[in-house]
């Protein structure tokens, strides 16, 4: 969007400011507490999700967010902007993995609770899902066209398992000493052949 000279403001939520990284690209972004999912072994823990979130603060942030000067809201399943757009009757486009589950072939397999989360956690007037298999209204995960100047290595592997049990992930990867793993997980620390990736650091 910045490439096309569109005025863009960014709002981040769901993770503590101290846990954010590589945020310089977003300039003076806004932060809200938002809502986040508690997970256990790769699955949503519904009880702890309900317990750890402040819904009073969430609705306060939603109602206080002034969208009167904005023409369009883009959300990547971020609930504060999505709900603020709905209340303000502003067009909102949802882009992300979660929106792929609105496709009938996937939606029909969800439980009622899962359907509720997909429909109402971060509602959008239009949506574009991301999915690695071809589906209507979905695109594959976005990959930068411009590659890093770092030489490509077949032994440098990107691992995206942010909701899995970190100890199990580490135990599975550490023995593979001939590979370097960049692991997307909120609690990962640099150790042996594992590191935490960042926007510009993975070839």
Residue ranges of model-derived segments:
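A generic structural motif
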Residues: 3-10, 68, 177-182
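Generic beta-sheet signal
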Residues: 11-13, 95-96, 130, 184
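Short hydrophobic signal-anchor/transmembrane segments that target glycosyltransferases
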Residues: 165-183
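Active-site proximal beta-strand in glycosyltransferases
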Residues: 86-103
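A nucleotide-sugar donor-handling region in carbohydrate enzymes
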Residues: 102-166, 183-202
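Conserved nucleotide-sugar phosphate-binding/catalytic loop shared by glycosyltransferases and other
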Residues: 3-57
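A short helix->loop->beta-strand "cap" motif at the edges of active sites that frequently abuts
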Residues: 88-91, 124-125, 177-179
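Conserved nucleotide-sugar donor-binding subdomain of glycosyltransferases
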Residues: 40-72, 77-80
